Amino acid sequence: MNKVITDLDKALSALKDGDTILVGGFGLCGIPEYAIDYIYKKGIKDLIVVSNNCGVDDFGLGILLEKKQIKKIIASYVGENKIFESQMLNGEIEVVLTPQGTLAENLHAGGAGIPAYYTPTGVGTLIAQGKESREFNGKEYILERAITGDYGLIKAYKSDTLGNLVFRKTARNFNPLCAMAAKICVAEVEEIVPAGELDPDEIHLPGIYVQHIYKGEKFEKRIEKITTRSTK
């Protein structure tokens, strides 16, 4: 089955207000630039977003904050966005800060069909408030629940026409997990090859988790902070 599309509208036309989207990336590395721009232009709002971060003021998920399209964000780091900070302090957006490893495992559990699991991370902190706790072998654990979403929006380096994906280095990050935990996964890629051309050993995410593949013409790939030094 050829999963390649040339128009994101074919994959995202059913995305509606109030849906939950799982967005890959770490900072600005490996983010689905085209899908985010599509949502921004369509004005889809009241979204529940699950992502490592919320982009920067004018790029990534940050552009969805400009028109207040995000109702709730579940993330592990949100410190690079002034618009986000303002909306959070003014009570305009619901924020669920989650330890990074816990966020990854919540998505993994969702993709694996595991409804909940116990972890020691967050015990004795604000993270544990309102959560069930139990003791195992003399150590306290809190119950974390799996995360699933309506759409997984991810970015990969290469795909074959069946949706088998290859990521590049750190750009892999949360992308495979967002694909696994979503009902529908839309993968943006830089290169598409015929089915059978990828060595099975180099495939990072099997095509069973991917419903649509979109080849971007050019990815901006911004850097959050550029640090330079004098040539002297």
From Swiss-Prot:
Q: What class of enzyme is it?
A: transferase
Do you know which Pfam families this protein is assigned to? CoA_trans
Q: Where does CoA bind?
A: 24-30
S-S bridge residues: none
Q: Is Transferase a UniProt keyword of this protein?
A: yes
> MF terms per GO, please?
succinyl-CoA:3-oxo-acid CoA-transferase activity
Catalyses which reaction? a 3-oxo acid + succinyl-CoA = a 3-oxoacyl-CoA + succinate
Q: What EC number(s) does this enzyme carry?
A: 2.8.3.5
Q: Which UniProt keywords apply?
A: Transferase
- SUPFAM superfamilies named in the record: NagB/RpiA/CoA transferase-like (SSF100950)
Subunit structure comment from the entry? Heterodimer of a subunit A and a subunit B.
What does the sequence similarity comment in the record state about its family? Belongs to the 3-oxoacid CoA-transferase subunit A family.
Q: What is this protein called?
A: Succinyl-CoA:3-ketoacid coenzyme A transferase subunit A
Which organism does this sequence originate in?
Helicobacter pylori (strain ATCC 700392 / 26695)
Q: What is the lineage of its organism?
A: Bacteria, Pseudomonadati, Campylobacterota, Epsilonproteobacteria, Campylobacterales
